Structures are given as C-alpha cells and as structure tokens.
Amino acid sequence: MASRRPKKPTKALMKIAVSGLLAGAGALALFGFYAEMQADAMGPEAATSLAAAIPTPASIRGYEALAQAALARQPLAPADLDLARTASLKTLSLDPGNVSAWNRLAYIDLADDGRLSRDGMAAIYKSYEVSPYGNPQVMMWRVDFATRSWTSLPDDIRRATLDQLPVIGGIYVTWDWRVETCRENPYPEIWQPICAATPGIDRPAAR
C-alpha cells in the first residue's frame, strides 16, 4: 500500500491547536514544539493568524521558530514579514532583552519598504541598548545590517557600529567574515580597520 503524503495544516487543525493552547499554562508549554513542527508547513497567512491568536505568556522557543521560518521563505512576501514581526513582538513581551528579536524587527522594517522607519530605527537603538557588543554573530550581523543603510544612519548608530570592529577583529572565529568584509565592504571606515585586523589579507585594487 502506498504511503500517504502528510496533509498540510487546516483551519480546523489550527483551531484545535489554539483551543488546546488556551486551555491552561501546561498546554501553553507545548507551543514551542508545535510551532517548530508546523511553521514550515503552513502558509504565512495561516501562521500569522496562529501567532496572533496565542496569548502571552507562551513559548519564546515557539515564537522564535515562527519568526525564523517566516524570514527563511524566498521570496519574502508581506505576510511573511507580518508573521515574523508578530512573533518577534511576542518574544519581546516575554524577554525584552532578546537582542535577536530587536535585530529582526529592524531587519523587517528595512525589508518592508527598503528604508528604516522610526520603528526600525528604534529597534536597532534597542539592540545596542540591551547588548552593546554581544556575541560575534550579533556584532557581525549589525555591521552587515548597518552597511545596507549606512548613509541614512544617524552618527551615534554609526559610531556604535564602528565601536564593534576592534572587538570583532580580536575574535578568531570571525576570520571568514573579516576576509569578506575587508575585500567587499564599500565603506572605508568599516573595511579599513577590519583589513588591519586581518593579517595577510589585502583589499583588491579598485578597477
């Protein structure tokens, strides 16, 4: 007998899941597992409805899974951005110091219309407030993000970005990123200190 293909989540399944999650605190703990299993399978509109319907408190792990799955879709649709924004805000309602969620909100804002609005700027400010340096991945991400909108960033955000460069330069695991940044970043104030911190790597001559 041929094996059956797994069915995609239906509205009825979503209602059952939400009803169960609303039943009590113990059931809410299941949301993280459920979200990770279903985020890739359901459409962005359905997942957005699910994320919005589930009250706080619930699971940071689940909200993070929903946000990451939404932003992994290509090409990104408005519904994907809405889902990632909703899930990120849910994360922050539980953990206001979650730097990844603040970074995501800034990214979503920029992806929405190609420029940072007041909300996106507030999110990147908050990112630096809760984690001025953070782990290497956070710092490298913020430099790359700043590069995308460098000319429109206020001086204090540029300064905060540049202040991370000496720290990144002293971390061995950032080597590959430093090589790429030294060779490819268009802004001298970024690539010059990174090249200086990456011995043996030269920036190709301008053509």
Model-predicted segments: where are they?
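TPR alpha-solenoid repeat register
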Residues: 60-62, 101, 137-138
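N-terminal alpha-helical interaction modules that lie
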Residues: 2-78, 82, 89, 158-207
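TPR/TPR-like alpha-solenoid helical repeat scaffolds
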Residues: 110, 137-153, 177-188
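Canonical positions in the second alpha-helix
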Residues: 90-91, 127
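Short coil/turn linking the two alpha-helices of tandem helical-hairpin repeats
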Residues: 39-42, 67-78, 106, 110-117, ...
